[in-house]
């Protein structure tokens, strides 16, 4: 089971100067996946419980297959294209994604990836040079799996390290749709 939180961050709505499109049910969503734990454990964590009170938790959400990467691929395109591994893939640019739908409607989007070493990083993984810990992995970054994002610099620039979240919040630049991925240590294990 994939455990995740979706937050309707209406409190942030008034502080963003990024392009804004009024939503029917909510104006902003932040999706945070905690894939390697049971829902009850994640919901019982005091920090996550506090965060869940700020928005909504989707409790009937399940993986489409195993291992990880096909689920991340499906999260923004609705299909996993028969992927049954976590190896490096590049899904062709003719495949439509949520990014296309959001941009067609003028809705801002972005990803924040914990321990991703730089904006638009496309490598398979990033290990902490001090500890050797495998912190960031591409298989958990849905947008860069698609050539329609990875091959376009303006789109690739919207995939950022999580450290950029605070700066974007401070400068009123948070997008309306956000996908936030914890690193391999913090993903709910």
List each language-model region with its residue ranges.
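Fungal secretory targeting signals
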Residues: 1-18
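N-terminal pro-sequences and low-complexity stem/linker regions of secreted or lumenal proteins
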Residues: 18-189
